[in-house]
């Protein structure tokens, strides 16, 4: 389990109701930070960072209703009666979008 620092007012920080996420990780791939500014300039938001190693953990596209991608694995800590905040937020977005 690693601590991911969540950007204030990001969707993911609202879902977790926190400025950090504690989730399991399995790093085989990393985002190449040399592309960060280019991708930010076209609307990608880097909303979660593992600060100890400056690793991008969460990205969002704020212009879309729900677009969150994570390097951590929320499925490892979800349980049938206790889903992680990312899963709950995703299901809620689906329901609200289909009204």
Swiss-Prot record:
| Pathway note | Pyrimidine metabolism; CTP biosynthesis via de novo pathway; CTP from UDP: step 2/2
**Bridged cysteine pairs (disulfide):** none
Query: What are the binding positions for L-glutamine in this chain?
Result: 28
Question: Which biological process annotations from GO are given for this protein?
Answer: 'de novo' CTP biosynthetic process; pyrimidine nucleobase biosynthetic process
Gene3D superfamilies in the record: 3.40.50.880
The miscellaneous comment for this protein is:
CTPSs have evolved a hybrid strategy for distinguishing between UTP and CTP. The overlapping regions of the product feedback inhibitory and substrate sites recognize a common feature in both compounds, the triphosphate moiety. To differentiate isosteric substrate and product pyrimidine rings, an additional pocket far from the expected kinase/ligase catalytic site, specifically recognizes the cytosine and ribose portions of the product inhibitor.
In which family does this protein belong, per the annotation?
Answer: Belongs to the CTP synthase family.
Name under which the protein is recorded: CTP synthase
Q: Give the originating organism.
A: Mycoplasma capricolum subsp. capripneumoniae
Its gene is pyrG
């Amino acid at each position: 389990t690693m601590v991911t620092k969540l950007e204030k007012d990001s969707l993911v920080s609202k879902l977790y109701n926190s400025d950090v996420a504690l989730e399991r990780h399995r790093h085989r791939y990393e985002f190449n930070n040399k592309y960060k500014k280019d991708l930010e300039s076209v609307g990608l938001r880097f909303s979660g960072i593992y600060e100890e190693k400056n690793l991008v953990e969460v990205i969002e596209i704020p212009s879309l209703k729900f677009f969150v991608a994570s390097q951590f694995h929320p499925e490892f800590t979800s349980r049938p009666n206790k889903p992680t905040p990312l899963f709950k937020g995703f299901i809620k977005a689906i329901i609200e979008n289909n009204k």
